[in-house]
Curated annotation (Swiss-Prot):
Residues 357-492 form the PLAT domain. Keywords: Disulfide bond, Glycoprotein, Heparin-binding, Hydrolase, Lipid degradation, Lipid metabolism, Secreted, Signal. This is Putative endothelial lipase. It is found in: Secreted.
Length: 497
């Protein structure tokens, strides 16, 4: 039975304090021998007897089947015969999957799913699970210290493999979850050569946030480092996933904050079922499932867009693909090494396939008359060549700008194709808003301020995925209505991704 990870949220501040106290005590009262990391000495002792593979605290399991129960083939540095026994192909692409901290001493359920997806996508590749459960099932602070030990062990294995004739580090892809992401970083730091790629799946935040690059995952650890951040929201002053960018590309699905399917409504349902453990890990593990999604749904790849912060992305400002400002996420990501901003953002669905379709709306409001203090809520419905959308809410972060182009981000879960027309709707319980619209021939006529509350010239729509643009004008309007229907008046234009 798995221990409840919810305790982590309550105990992390205490664990961190205990770790600091223990470090101060050891430094003040212990001799040089006592200060030596016990885990390091234990692993070093075991390395002197490499034949006792099952006794090692770090095991490298070659997965020949998706089922963990059937996986019983280990490789270790210096034991050439184990490569043959495990059918390890030194010339093939090799994945190393590295799990994170554990409270129950067991593999997490996502590992089977990820291994199976890798084997299905790359049938000739080696898939190796780095089993460090014995060192991970410790107090969090101790497990953090053990990540360096595991990184050194894996680096030693890679150095040994690199001595083989056809083995190349550029074909190695380390995939680390939570603490496992930082283990991948240490591995790249300690290995003699340059590892091809590291993917960090929501790297752990506590004790790594703000740390020196040599003490956490960083862009220097591989030829290419990509990171998915899915749990960067602080709880009790601590973020479970690291908030800072630590790769060449750092992707923040849904702002790295609340993930669809992990919100308040889902919390209440989960509590009713008594599955609080699944609730807490929902956002943290979402990074794994997004990566799996990129492996199994090749025809439904999610796109992310470069932006300086989540706030600007939510306003729809950052849907450009110029100069490599957009990219697919997960396994199929295009390698880019940004020297400045590496942050990218996207919206997702609550489950696989996670892909959504992003749209930027630009609405120029010439004038309006507010009849109350509360802004109305807006929604828009798309009618396209492939289908229609549900009403999509427009998030108004500030007041509607007068004589100003207001930009919004909306997204659909299904592809509606090219936009043919849209319906703009607004409503409020505390005030009335009326629309004003006319054909272009009537646009320059003087409006009647006593009856016309909202004046819009036209709406521009841009698709993030296709980069197609459309301009829409009025189809018809009713003076007392809160609904405005518009049709495309110009042919769309597109810019290739």
């Amino acid at each position: 039975m798995r221990a409840c990870p919810f305790l982590l949220l309550l105990l992390l501040p205490l664990l961190l304090s205990l770790g600091r106290i223990a470090a101060v005590r050891d430094a003040a009262g212990a001799g040089p021998e006592r200060r030596q990391d016990d885990s390091v000495s234990q692993v070093q002792k075991l390395r002197e007897e490499p034949s006792k593979v099952r006794d090692l605290q770090v095991k490298f399991i070659v997965r020949t089947t998706p089922d963990l129960d059937d996986a019983d083939c280990y490789i270790t540095a210096g034991q050439d015969h184990l490569l043959d026994d495990c059918n390890f192909n030194v010339s093939a692409k090799t994945f190393f999957v590295i799990h994170g901290w554990t409270m129950g001493g067991m593999y997490e359920r996502w590992l089977d799913t990820l291994v199976s997806a890798l084997q299905e996508r790359e049938k000739e590749a080696n898939v190796v699970v780095v089993n460090w459960l014995a060192l991970a099932q410790q107090l969090y602070t101790i497990a953090v210290n053990n990540t360096r030990v595991v990184g050194k062990e894996l680096a030693g294995l890679l150095d040994w493999l690199e001595e083989k004739k056809d083995f190349q580090l550029k074909n190695v892809h380390l995939i680390g979850y939570s603490l496992g992401a930082h283990i991948a970083g240490y591995t790249g730091n300690y290995a003699r050569g340059i590892i091809g790629r590291i993917t960090g799946l929501d790297p752990a935040g506590p004790m790594f946030e703000g740390a020196d690059p040599s003490r956490r995952l960083s862009p220097d650890d591989a030829d290419f480092v990509d990171v998915l951040h899915t749990y960067t929201r602080e709880t009790l002053g601590i973020s479970i996933g690291i908030q800072m960018p630590v790769g060449h590309i750092d992707i923040y699905p849904n702002g790295g904050d609340i993930q669809p399917g992990c919100g308040l409504t889902d919390i209440l349902g989960t509590l009713a079922l008594g599955e609080i453990g699944d609730l807490v890990i929902c956002e943290h593990e979402r990074s794994v499932h997004l990566f799996v999604d990129s492996l199994v749904n090749k025809d439904k790849q999610s796109f992310a867009f470069q932006c300086t912060d989540s706030g600007r992305f939510k306003k729809g400002i950052c849907l450009s693909c110029r100069k490599n400002r957009c990219n697919s996420i997960g396994y199929n990501i295009k390698k880019m090494r940004n020297k400045r901003n590496s942050k990218m953002y996207l919206k997702t669905r609550a489950g696989m396939p996670f892909k959504v379709f992003h749209y930027q709306l630009k609405i120029h409001v010439f004038s309006y008359k507010s009849l109350g203090e509360t802004e109305p809520s807006f929604s828009v419905t798309f009618y396209g060549t492939s289908g229609d959308s549900e009403p999509l809410p427009l998030e108004v972060s500030d007041q509607i700008g007068l004589n100003y182009t207001n930009t919004f981000l909306v997204y659909t879960e299904e592809d509606v194709g090219d936009i043919l027309r849209i319906k703009l709707t607004w409503e409020s319980t505390t005030q009335s808003w009326y629309n004003f619209w006319s054909q272009m021939k009537n646009y320059w006529s003087k409006p009647d301020p006593s009856s016309k509350e909202l004046q819009i010239r036209r709406i521009r729509v841009k698709s993030g995925e296709t980069q197609k643009k459309a301009m829409l004008a009025v189809e018809f309007w009713e003076l007392k209505s809160t609904c405005l229907k518009m049709v495309k008046v110009e042919k769309h234009c597109s810019r290739p991704l």
